[in-house]
Amino acid sequence: MKCIVGLGNPGKKFEMTRHNVGFLAIDRLAEKHGISLNEAKFNALMGTGRINGERVVLVKPLTYMNLSGEAVRPILDYYKIEIDDLLVIYDDLDMVPGKLRFRPKGSAGGHNGIKSLIQHLGTAEFKRLKLGIGRPPHPIKVVDWVLMNYRKDELPELNETLDNAVTAATDFVDTDWLALMNRYN
């Protein structure tokens, strides 16, 4: 079984913010594969189903970004999912908008959601799909930028990014990791 987690913040006011691109990707992935995100447990909204014939659980932690690990660890334990079968989708300030990149492991890089996951999983060696949101233009602060809604003129690029993320996450389920990185990076 695979676990695909999208990071974000719960609630209507955060729905279309840059920090919620992981949630948006999970919503679109669930829709594409007919998986209902209707199970609320372990401080997360989740749904189970099949992608490319493999069992998956899709997860949106409801703990707020900075505490994401509190939701993910119990889910992995409950379903007996190995760290190697986990993919985390999240926003990356240091990548241009529209770009996506798989990473096999790494530091938190200043991302508090990833920091929480590393703390609760006890390792930084979990797979990631980073979606670029870019750095804020001067004088906007990073904290304000990530919690800002996408502008209307940014929505076509966001939709393309989410479509690409769904394709990439779908491929994660049954594609060799090196082939996946070669294809998308």
Swiss-Prot record:
GO BP, one annotated term: rescue of stalled ribosome
Q: GO MF terms on file?
A: peptidyl-tRNA hydrolase activity; tRNA binding
Q: Give the positions of the site Stabilizes the basic form of H active site to accept a proton.
A: D91
So where's the catalytic machinery, residue-wise?
H19
> What are the alphabetically sorted keywords of the record?
Cytoplasm, Hydrolase, RNA-binding, tRNA-binding
Query: Which CDD domains does this entry report, sorted A to Z?
Result: PTH (cd00462)
Q: Does the keyword Magnesium apply?
A: no
Q: What is its EC number?
A: 3.1.1.29
One Pfam family from the record = Pept_tRNA_hydro
Mainly localized where? cytoplasm
The coiled-coil segments of this chain are none
Q: Which InterPro entries match?
A: Pept_tRNA_hydro, Pept_tRNA_hydro_CS, Pept_tRNA_hydro_sf
> Got a GO cellular component term for this one?
cytoplasm
Q: Where is this site: Discriminates between blocked and unblocked aminoacyl-tRNA?
A: N9
Where found in the cell?
Answer: Cytoplasm
Q: Where does tRNA bind?
A: F14, Y64, N66, N112
Catalyses: an N-acyl-L-alpha-aminoacyl-tRNA + H2O = an N-acyl-L-amino acid + a tRNA + H(+)
Per the entry, what this protein does is: Hydrolyzes ribosome-free peptidyl-tRNAs (with 1 or more amino acids incorporated), which drop off the ribosome during protein synthesis, or as a result of ribosome stalling.
Task: Kindly give the NCBIfam families that the UniProt entry links to this protein.
Answer: pth (TIGR00447)
Quaternary structure and partners: Monomer.
Q: Which family does it belong to?
A: Belongs to the PTH family.
The name of this protein is Peptidyl-tRNA hydrolase
User: What species was this sequence derived from?
Assistant: Exiguobacterium sp. (strain ATCC BAA-1283 / AT1b)
